[in-house]
Structure formats: C-alpha cells, structure tokens
C-alpha cells in the first residue's frame, strides 16, 4: 500500500484543539497569507522588494479538492474518523481531541472555505497579502486556521521560486538590451537543473513550475506535467536538449575522449543541439585542442526543423566567472587566462550585434550550471560585456543551490488571522510583539488590496463592503475552484511587468 497524505493530518498538532480555545460563540475566522520581509533574501542589489505570487491554483486543485475528496470526503466516515481519533489519542492523550466536528465536516461533504487572491503572476509588494481565507459556515470557524500549516508549506516555495526566476530573467533581459542580444533568446537562457537537489520529486515539480513562469528551459520533466494538469499549460511549456553526463564521458574513457565527442557530434546527433559535459578531465584541452580538430564536423552539422545545429560545451567545475570570462591571474595567453568564450571566438568566430558586441558562431555555445547564483550570473554577464561579448553567448543552468537554498523566511511568508466574529459581533485582530523589530506586526481587521503606481497597496480595518472591493477575487469557495489562470496568462502578466526593466541598467 502506497503512502498517502491524510488531509486531516496535514497540520501541526497544536491546531487540533484550537477549536475549543477560541472564545465561546466564535463564528468566523478571517486570515491572510503575506510576504513580510526580504531581509534574508539573497537577491541582486537593485531588487525592488516585490515577490511573484504563484502556486495557489495548483494547491487548491491538488490538495484542497483532490486530496480532501480522495482522502476524506470520499472515504467511509467511520474509518477516517477512527484513524483521526487514533492519531490524536496516541500523541496527545486519550480523548484529548473530540471528533464530533470532524464527523460534521464529513457529513457536509466539502470544505466550507472561501479564498480570495490576487491574480497569479502578480508582482506584490512586501507586507501586502496575496490571499485571504474565511470559513463560509459558522459551525466550521475552526477550519480557517486549521489549514494554515499546509497552506503555508505548499505556497511559500512556489512563490519564492517564481520570484527568483523572475529576477534571473530581469537580469538577463537587461544585459540583452545593453549588448544588443536577442530578447527572444532570454526564455531559454535560464535552464532549470534543480530537480535532483529538491526536497522530493513532488517539490521538484511544484517548484519547477515557478521557474517556468519566466523561462521555458528546463530539465524538470515533472514540472511540465504539473503545469499541464493544474495550469492548463499548452504549446511550448518547457524545452530541453540531448545532453551527456560524466558517466557517459567516463565510459568512453579518457584516451578516447576525442572520439566520444566525434561520435556524439557526427553519429548520434548530426543535427539540432547537443550539450556535452566537457570538464570530465581537461576542459581547456577540449576547447583548445578537440574543438579545433572537430571544427569542420561541428560546422557541417545539419540544422534541424528549427534551424538549429549547435554544439554546446558544458564546463561543470571551478570558478564560473573565471571559466567563462578568463582568469586574470593565470599565465598570460593560456586558455585559462582567455576563458571559454574568448577561446571559442578565436576558433569559430561569429557575428556582431547592432551595438557592436560579439556573438559566437551559431554552431557553438556554452552552458554553465555549477554553483550559479544571481550574483555569479551578474558577474559573468558583466565580464562578458567588458570583453565585448553579448549576453546571449551563455545559458545558465539554475540548480538547487538557487531553488532549494531558501526557506519560508526568505520572504517572511506567514498566515495570520486579522478578523473574527463572536456572537454576531466582529473583532479586529492583530499582533504587535514588543520584543520584535516590527516585522511580525500584523495587519488588522478586514483587508482590501488595491493597485497602485508602485504595485499593490494594503488597506486594513475595512468594512465588509470595502472588503468586497479591490483586487482580491474569489478563487475557491465551498470545495470548488471558481477562477482559473493558465500558465500562458501568468507568463503574459509577468512579461508585461518586465517591460519596465528593459530600459534600466
């Protein structure tokens, strides 16, 4: 029997009995999910302090609908209730948590919750809620914050990944504009290499779609599946190319490495793009010696249906900036001193952009996916520009150091209740710890979010009529997904917001 998540148990234990801890007569609890601070985020120096909101629709469909239906509502009531009681009894103590409210929820047959949210793909200012949630039936007031644990766990990562992916795209777009490179090429310049370093394959899928909001280059196969299933993705969702790994090169043996390259280039992949890991033994020898011997084979490869016939060399170790742009401390005029891009230029030549920056011959290219961060990517692009090369000469492999070296605290995401109703009377709730720096101070009361010149602005302490206005729209209500966005629509929203960065340096 395979392991399945019981949605009732997707909580922290302390949530189980909060129902009794609320004041007698509690009827409604209203909470929000908000990025509070970028203090711990390792972003670029000119980061504008906005996150990309993404991931809610997938969470709603996968967890709030599918998992709850399959794991609770569609199961025999006596069975699921007894399982829940056993879990509570064995960990919290016999009879510590009653089950009548769980039985009532099963009888109801759906989650009596309403979630309002900003459009996915919005870039949202810090301390502005991206969503609110409230129970729709007074009997189930406890349910709003019962789902806090899973809502937070499932949403912070997708938004954080999408935010970082957008930052890579912003950086690449700015350098494409500066050096006259093709803007259309940027969507393949960030390639997702992160799957093997993520927290499980589901995490790789879910996070990987965050990458796909800004790029189409990916090796995360499951991310495309997730995008198709939960975001109606169609057309070009994600693309990759044939590529080798070190085991392939090692099996070919060091003494036959040149022949391994030749076989890959001429026999296995005589057309299209092929990426070959090139530092299994001596990267500089591959570029300065092997590529010269294989030059005519490389130039004679046949373009595929897309007109592509490129051999991509992949270094996978060392200092990325020095490998690509050259090491000024190396012996002068050696391959290490010149760097990979300059070496390929000397061997294969190329063309120039309208701004006068060099573009490698269309038959060769580079991809670097080891130890890439936003800061290293920026340093490489600066180095290429200084050497007179366009930014399009390199593809960045973005790995788990970027997409998994983060936490919920990267952007301070938190779920907080700000309003409730007890015996028919509303109560404005807020926290403001005297021992805190101000980051944990919450909004207060019912909330409204409006568009502003700088993104979005929060208005708290709103009336019910005011709360119904603004940019937060109902996306989930009483077990149903009410409003859908496709991946294409999300990409378009982000692309529109990218326009303002094209003229900035």
UniProtKB/Swiss-Prot annotation:
Q: Which residues bind beta-nicotinamide D-ribonucleotide?
A: 219, 314-316, 369-370, 408
Q: What EC designation does it have? A: 2.4.2.12
InterPro entries, sorted: Aldolase_TIM, DUF5598, N/Namide_PRibTrfase, Nicotinamide_PRibTrfase, Nicotinate_pribotase-like_C
What induces or represses expression of this protein, per its UniProt record? Repressed by the ADP-ribose-responsive repressor NrtR.
State the Gene Ontology terms under molecular function.
Answer: nicotinamide phosphoribosyltransferase activity
Query: Pathway listed for it?
Result: Cofactor biosynthesis; NAD(+) biosynthesis; nicotinamide D-ribonucleotide from 5-phospho-alpha-D-ribose 1-diphosphate and nicotinamide: step 1/1
Q: Which CDD domains match?
A: PBEF_like (cd01569)
According to its UniProt entry, one GO biological process term is: NAD biosynthetic process
Per the UniProt record, one Pfam family is NAMPT_N
Q: Which UniProt keywords apply?
A: Glycosyltransferase, Pyridine nucleotide biosynthesis, Transferase
Tell me what controls its activity.
10-fold more active in the presence of saturating ATP.
Phenotypic consequence of gene deletion: The nadB-nadV double mutant can grow only in a minimal medium supplemented with niacin (nicotinamide or nicotinic acid).
- Protein family according to the UniProt entry: Belongs to the NAPRTase family.
Briefly, what is this protein's role?
A: Catalyzes the condensation of nicotinamide with 5-phosphoribosyl-1-pyrophosphate to yield nicotinamide mononucleotide, an intermediate in the biosynthesis of NAD. Functions in the nondeamidating salvage pathway for production of NAD from nicotinamide. Displays a strict preference for nicotinamide over nicotinate substrate.
UniProt protein name: Nicotinamide phosphoribosyltransferase
């Amino acid at each position: 029997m395979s392991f399945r998540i019981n949605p009732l148990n997707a909580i922290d234990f302390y949530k189980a009995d909060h129902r009794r801890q609320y004041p007698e007569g509690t009827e409604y609890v209203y909470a929000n999910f908000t990025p509070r601070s970028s203090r711990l985020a390792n972003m670029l120096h000119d980061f504008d302090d906005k996150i990309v909101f993404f991931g809610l629709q997938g969470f709603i469909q996968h967890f709030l609908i599918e998992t709850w239906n399959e794991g609770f509502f569609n199961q025999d009531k006596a069975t699921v209730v007894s399982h829940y009681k056993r879990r509570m009894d064995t960990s919290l103590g016999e009879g510590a948590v009653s089950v009548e409210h769980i039985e009532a929820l099963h009888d109801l047959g759906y989650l009596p919750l309403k979630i309002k949210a900003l459009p996915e793909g919005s870039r949202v200012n810090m301390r502005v809620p991206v969503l609110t949630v409230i129970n729709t039936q007074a009997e189930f007031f406890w349910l709003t914050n019962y789902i806090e644990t899973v809502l937070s766990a499932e949403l912070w990562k997708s938004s954080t990944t999408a935010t970082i992916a957008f930052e890579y795209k912003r950086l690449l777009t700015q350098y494409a504009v500066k050096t006259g490179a093709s803007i259309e090429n940027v969507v393949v310049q960030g390639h997702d290499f992160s799957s093997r370093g993520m927290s499980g394959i589901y995490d790789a899928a879910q996070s990987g779609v965050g990458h796909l909001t800004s790029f189409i280059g990916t090796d995360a196969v499951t991310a495309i599946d997730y995008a198709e299933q939960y975001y109606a993705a169609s057309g070009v969702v994600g693309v990759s190319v044939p590529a080798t790994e070190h085991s392939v090169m090692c099996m070919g043996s060091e003494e036959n490495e040149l022949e391994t390259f030749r076989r890959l280039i001429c026999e296995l992949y005589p057309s299209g793009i092929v990426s070959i890991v090139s530092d299994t033994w001596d990267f500089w020898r591959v570029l300065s010696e092997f590529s010269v011997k294989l030059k005519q084979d490389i130039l004679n490869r046949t373009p595929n249906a897309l007109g592509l016939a490129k051999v991509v060399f992949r270094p996978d170790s060392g200092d990325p900036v020095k490998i690509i742009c050259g090491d000024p401390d190396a012996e002068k005029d050696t391959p290490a001193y010149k760097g990979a891009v300059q070496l390929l230029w000397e061997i294969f030549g190329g063309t120039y952009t309208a701004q006068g920056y060099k573009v490698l011959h269309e038959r060769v290219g580079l991809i670097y996916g080891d130890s890439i961060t936003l800061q290293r990517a920026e340093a490489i692009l600066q180095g290429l520009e200084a050497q007179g090369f366009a930014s399009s000469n390199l593809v960045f492999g973005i790995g788990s150091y970027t997409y998994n070296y983060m936490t919920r605290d990267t952007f301070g995401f938190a779920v907080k209740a700000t309003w409730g109703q007890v015996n028919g009377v509303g109560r404005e709730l807020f926290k403001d710890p005297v021992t805190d720096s101000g980051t944990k101070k919450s909004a207060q009361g019912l909330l409204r979010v409006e568009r502003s010149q700088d993104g979005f602005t929060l208005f708290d302490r709103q009336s019910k009529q005011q709360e119904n206005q603004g940019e937060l729209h109902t996306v989930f209500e009483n077990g149903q997904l009410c409003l859908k966005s496709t991946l294409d629509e999300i990409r378009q929203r982000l692309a529109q917001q990218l326009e303002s960065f094209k003229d900035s340096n």
